């Protein structure tokens, strides 16, 4: 056994005792969790930290209460080491309401706002972009904090790893990336998954200074972590610490462990960090007779108390099932601070830009980031001139890494900033769907209400510009399917101008879909000093005979169709959804109650569409108001083609809306 004190700082006896106590505390907690799992007290997946305790103990000893921690699904030890009380962690393992996430997260999703513990993350590599965003928020606010991000060797194969380290190095952010390299990603050996098995070289290639340390030696880990934390606190940018470690137990309780040799496991157990430190302390006269037994007794008592309290704690009542999906927005939304007092003649592009300028001028927490939004001025020129006006810290060009910078936006929102993330086009958002759906939409719920995500994501959507199948789809209904997200689709100049301010006042993640065919459209912007209500649909044209229901880029076509129908003696009411999630069902049902017929115009595909959802709502809630079948006008079910005539044929056009309206009125077969 190597001497753990060689090449390391001299530590006091009290300090070494504390390191030993912390490792023992984590080990005993995890062992008890295994027992409780076999008794079916803990369910789901259980990933224990047994064998790896030296990593968390050594690194986290150097963190302060203001520093942030982002972890993995094997995070029980990190949570305990980050000052979350054991009783709250154990209650969460049980799924009880007294747990640190109110029982909503369970073993893989421990959170605590007071401890600045931003969660276990069950998506491999999913926490790395969040850590980047937390550090970015601190840097923008001038706070001297560090974010420690723990992950395994498997995460180093994920795109999020490369995107996150690149962003952190590019922006010189105070992130300590801690790779707990236990040689296996679930059951896949490092050598089978990585052509380059020296993980420090991956970090160095991305511009992050890196070091590798024996992760079974708590003193060595602490010393390496302290060196890196010193550099971080000095403003020297991110650091990468690889800790070579080993888990003594299976990946999870369902793992038969057929992929590693028993002799290998036993060889690593010979390097167990707990006896390694304890035996060295005994030989050095630093661990006195009876002291370890006393530590074990204290830990056992704490553990028994935590289990007893978890057993006695209440389950969250079913009546609260729908809690923690959204944070309640303010009942009174502050009006836009820079609302115009006179009408303006302008384009939708200019209206969107006015909204951005207002947000940046009147809320110092707001910043904009995305691809080509600064020097280039935005793919659709919405942000042109903003870099010169607000500077590169707040108009932040990003690499082509949608998942990375969107996740960083989510992390920045967790860190008290108000980010506006621009994704160039909806098709590119699919590269960020992991972070949008698995993080932005779920963090409030998984944390039991501990962490909201006040984030705005803007993106272009829709077809009509002859840019074919990878830049042209209308996929907003996919996001409207997801609880935890709010989805907006402006179709008027007033909404283009004022929706952003309202979205920034909302404490939830808000996605704004800007139809590409609106950017060049011009009109008169009437002043709206009270702002817009992003909870409600809007009646854009009253009528008594037929409800035309639409949103976004289809609104101008629908209004044109309504005008043509009026010439035929049909008074159509035009309902602009504006808000795709949560839908304003009351306005929809009320409109149908007046007109008794409905045509839904939706640029998405018909199968699984928003139009289908609205039709179902009307059938469920207003069936007896219907005098005719509901009609849907949607895009033909093909990828958007390039040729102009085929693209036009695929998309809903005024003639299609008119034909559907006439069928609903019984005037056309």
PLM feature segments, named:
Residues 36-42, 107-121, 144-150, 183-184, ...:
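Glycine/charged-rich beta-loop-alpha catalytic/anionic-binding loops adjacent to active sites
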Residues 466-549:
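Phosphate/diphosphate-binding glycine-rich loops and adjacent basic-rich segments that engage nucleotide
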Residues 57, 115-308, 312, 374-450, ...:
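Thiamine diphosphate
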Residues 1-55, 243, 248-249, 253-390, ...:
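Conserved acidic/glycine
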């Amino acid at each position: 056994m190597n001497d753990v004190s060689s090449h390391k700082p001299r530590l006091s006896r009290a300090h070494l005792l504390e390191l030993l106590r912390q490792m023992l505390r984590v080990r005993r907690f995890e062992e008890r969790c295994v027992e409780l799992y076999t008794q079916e007290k803990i369910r789901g997946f259980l990933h224990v930290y047994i064998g790896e305790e030296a990593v968390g103990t050594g690194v986290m000893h150097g963190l302060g209460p203001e520093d942030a921690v982002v972890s993995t699904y094997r995070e029980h030890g990190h949570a305990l080491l980050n000052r979350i009380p054991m009783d709250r962690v154990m209650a969460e393992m049980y799924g009880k309401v007294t747990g640190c996430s109110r029982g909503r997260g369970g073993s893989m999703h421990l959170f605590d706002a007071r401890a600045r513990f931003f969660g276990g993350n069950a998506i491999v590599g999913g926490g790395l972009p969040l850590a980047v965003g937390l550090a970015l928020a601190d840097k923008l606010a001038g706070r001297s904090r560090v974010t420690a991000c723990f992950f395994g060797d498997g995460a180093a194969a994920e795109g999020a790893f490369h995107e996150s380290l690149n962003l952190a190095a590019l922006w010189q952010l105070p992130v300590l990336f801690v790779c707990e390299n236990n040689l296996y990603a679930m059951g896949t050996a490092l050598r089978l998954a990585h052509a380059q098995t020296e993980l420090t070289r991956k970090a160095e290639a991305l511009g992050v200074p890196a070091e590798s340390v024996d992760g079974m030696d708590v003193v060595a880990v602490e010393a390496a972590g302290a060196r890196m934390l010193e550099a971080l606190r000095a403003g020297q940018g991110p650091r990468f610490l690889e800790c070579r470690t080993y888990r003594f137990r299976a990946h999870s309780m369902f793992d038969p462990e057929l992929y590693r040799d028993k002799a290998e496991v036993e060889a690593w157990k010979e390097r167990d960090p707990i006896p390694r430190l304890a035996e060295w302390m005994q030989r050095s006269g630093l661990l006195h007779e009876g002291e370890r037994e006393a530590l074990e007794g204290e830990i056992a008592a704490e553990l028994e108390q935590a289990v007893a309290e978890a057993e006695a704690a209440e389950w969250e009542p079913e009546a609260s099932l729908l809690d923690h999906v959204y944070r309640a927005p303010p009942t009174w939304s502050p009006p836009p601070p820079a609302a115009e007092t006179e009408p303006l003649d302008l384009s939708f592009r200019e209206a969107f830009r006015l909204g951005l300028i207002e947000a940046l001028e009147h809320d110092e927490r707001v910043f904009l980031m995305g691809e080509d939004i600064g020097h280039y001025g935005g793919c659709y020129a919405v942000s042109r001139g903003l870099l010169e006006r607000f500077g590169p810290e707040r108009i932040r060009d990003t690499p082509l890494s949608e998942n990375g910078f969107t996740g960083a936006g989510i992390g920045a929102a967790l860190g008290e900033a108000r980010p506006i993330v621009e994704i160039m086009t909806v098709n590119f958002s699919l590269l960020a769907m992991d972070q949008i759906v698995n993080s932005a939409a779920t963090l409030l719920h998984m944390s039991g209400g501990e962490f909201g995500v006040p984030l705005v994501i803007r993106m272009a959507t829709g077809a009509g510009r002859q840019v074919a199948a990878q830049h042209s789809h209308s996929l907003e209904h996919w996001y409207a399917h997801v609880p935890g997200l709010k989805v907006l689709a402006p179709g008027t100049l007033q909404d283009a101008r004022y929706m952003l301010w309202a979205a920034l006042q909302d404490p939830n993640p808000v996605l704004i879909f800007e139809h590409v065919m609106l950017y060049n459209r011009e009109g008169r912007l009437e002043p709206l000093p009270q702002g817009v209500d992003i909870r409600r649909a809007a009646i854009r044209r009253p009528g008594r005979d037929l409800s035309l229901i639409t949103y976004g880029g289809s609104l101008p076509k629908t209004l044109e169709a309504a005008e043509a129908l009026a010439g035929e003696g049909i008074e159509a009411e035009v309902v602009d959804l504006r808000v795709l999630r949560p839908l304003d069902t009351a306005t929809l049902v009320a409109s149908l109650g007046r007109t008794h017929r409905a045509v839904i115009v939706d640029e998405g595909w018909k199968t699984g569409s928003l139009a289908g959802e609205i039709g179902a709502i009307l059938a469920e809630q207003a069936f007896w108001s219907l005098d005719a079948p509901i009609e849907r006008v949607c895009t033909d079910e093909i990828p958007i083609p390039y040729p102009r005539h085929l693209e036009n044929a695929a998309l809903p056009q005024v003639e299609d809306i008119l034909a559907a309206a006439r069928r609903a009125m019984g005037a056309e077969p």
